[in-house]
């Protein structure tokens, strides 16, 4: 948790039984090292698991501060927004979506790799369609539909094709006169988006698509990895929502059981 008072600005760990606090990151000590980059430690958007690095989003780009190296690295440098950046478990990479495609950037070299290439107005990779965000994955993920493997070598993600989903007009009360926008919004009985489960292999830049029948009307989501990253589990729920299956997918073979 973050603790801020008249003298302290830090990330602390609190013993629930005794109330004893242990400082994990002293933001007051870090901030002078961020002055040149015009960053503030308290405004980080993510922290590495070992508390040695901070990720920032500033000026429409990603920056990473390494505490051991006392170094700020600009990871991206373009006009496009990096959405839902997630640090890999080993703290060496950051994954995100950009223009509805999935990307990863190496923190040390700032080399960006595009993992998918077919995003469009109706196709999204690692970025949820509206109905999945609202009803399946949940709002708390902010449209994020990708998940790191524990070994940091793979990312499972969902690919959405909204082309069969009817559009629905939504009025936004912005500005003086407001505006009308159109959202792919399935009503009861309408077609849902076509969903595929993919696994992106970071080292080879290859995507493996898990075997599924795209013509079956079902919900595919909620993946989680085994601790050794050898299997990826996910759930499939039929449209009537009375038959839930938990499947195991094998990243190298595409097969599920």
At which residue positions do the language-model features occur?
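Beta-propeller folds
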Residues: 1-257
